[in-house]
């Protein structure tokens, strides 16, 4: 019996040493998300906690942006290996000289909408005060302002709905998985006629994806491929196990003392998963759509945000620049 026990102990020790050796050789991959922990990033947290990243030899470390360390600043200064940007933000960055490559895409639809404070059609609010986020240019709101000659007075806010509820603005640009849910939870009545959903008016452009600098993409092809595969596995698992996924999300929320609750995070997860479904195929495709890249570039160029087109091939790391090496 003693020999059997000793044999079992030796077997356990060997397994532990092999596992420890694997962890020691896992490659560190630092990923800065677009915001502090929330269900918007659930699939990545799942991939970490369920060992999907570890299974492919990656030790993924999450970082959150701050007022002094934006996603772009951290990526540009090598403070992280990958960062999260909306498609339009990535196009803007690339068009202005910093080469980025998309390595994984979750969003397949626009979540942006404008909510009117006084129940009016947002398009009837010419000259009104419109609240928009400070953290990233609200490209679609700026384009709408110029295209429809809205002449909005811009009021920038950092991340809560108080400026709207207090009546300090006439409308607010929000995303359907965050501020829109907070307004509902606060009991604010939003009739469909008081909403402008960008996706329903020719502005359905994908949002957040994961990007690396082109030199990292070229020097670490296996790492980005493995990160994408494990991330997709995490999101697919999250869609099938929402309650356990929320347990994982709330663990991250508590560790960083984020003020939220499970109810709002559940609603956010449901909406994020809905936004991942492609409107044409009805499936989660985890890809950048070339037609949306072209649409975004056309809008941004027409309204002076960029001075050149950024091609789909360029964003995917298949060519350096439109018209070069195609």
Task: Please give the residue ranges for each predicted region.
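Pocket-lining segment of extracytoplasmic ligand-binding domains
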Residues: 88-89, 157-163, 167-258
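Boundary at the C-terminal end of the N-terminal hydrophobic targeting segment
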Residues: 24-26
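Conserved C-terminal helix/tail region of periplasmic/extracytoplasmic solute-binding proteins
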Residues: 293-326
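Secondary-structure end/capping motifs
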Residues: 220-305
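Bacterial N-terminal signal peptides that target proteins for export
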Residues: 2-12
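N-terminal signal peptide c-region/cleavage motif recognized by signal peptidases
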Residues: 20-21
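Short, glycine-/small- and polar/acidic-enriched structural segments
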Residues: 28-157, 163-174, 196-198
């Amino acid at each position: 019996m003693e020999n059997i026990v000793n044999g079992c102990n030796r077997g356990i020790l060997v397994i532990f040493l092999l596992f420890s050796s694997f962890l020691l050789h896992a490659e560190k991959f630092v990923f800065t998300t677009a915001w502090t922990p929330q269900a918007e990033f659930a699939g990545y947290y799942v991939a970490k906690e369920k060992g999907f990243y570890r299974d492919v030899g990656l030790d993924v470390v999450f970082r959150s942006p701050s007022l002094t360390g934006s996603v772009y600043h951290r990526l540009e200064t090598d403070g992280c290996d990958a960062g999260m940007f909306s498609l339009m933000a990535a196009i803007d960055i690339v068009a202005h000289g910093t080469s980025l490559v998309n390595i994984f895409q979750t969003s397949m639809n626009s979540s942006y909408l404008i909510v009117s404070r006084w129940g009016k059609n947002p398009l009837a609010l010419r000259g009104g005060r419109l609240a928009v986020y400070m953290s990233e240019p609200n490209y679609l709101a700026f384009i709408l302002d110029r295209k429809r000659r809205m002449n909005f007075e811009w009021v920038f806010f950092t991340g809560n709905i108080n400026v709207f509820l207090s009546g300090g603005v006439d409308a607010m640009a929000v995303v359907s998985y965050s501020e829109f849910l907070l307004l509902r939870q606060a009991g604010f009545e939003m009739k469909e006629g008081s909403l402008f959903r960008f996706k329903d008016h020719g502005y359905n452009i994908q949002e957040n994806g994961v990007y690396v600098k082109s030199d990292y993409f070229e020097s670490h092809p296996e790492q980005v491929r493995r990160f994408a595969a494990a991330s997709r596995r995490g999101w697919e698992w999250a869609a099938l196990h929402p309650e356990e996924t929320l347990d994982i999300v709330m663990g991250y929320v508590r560790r960083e003392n984020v003020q939220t609750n499970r109810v709002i995070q559940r609603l956010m997860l449901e909406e994020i998963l809905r936004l991942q479904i492609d409107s044409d195929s009805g499936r989660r495709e985890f890809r950048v759509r070339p037609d949306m890249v072209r649409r975004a570039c056309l809008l941004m160029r027409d309204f002076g945000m960029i001075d050149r087109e950024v091609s789909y091939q360029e964003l995917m790391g298949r060519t350096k620049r439109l018209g070069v090496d195609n």
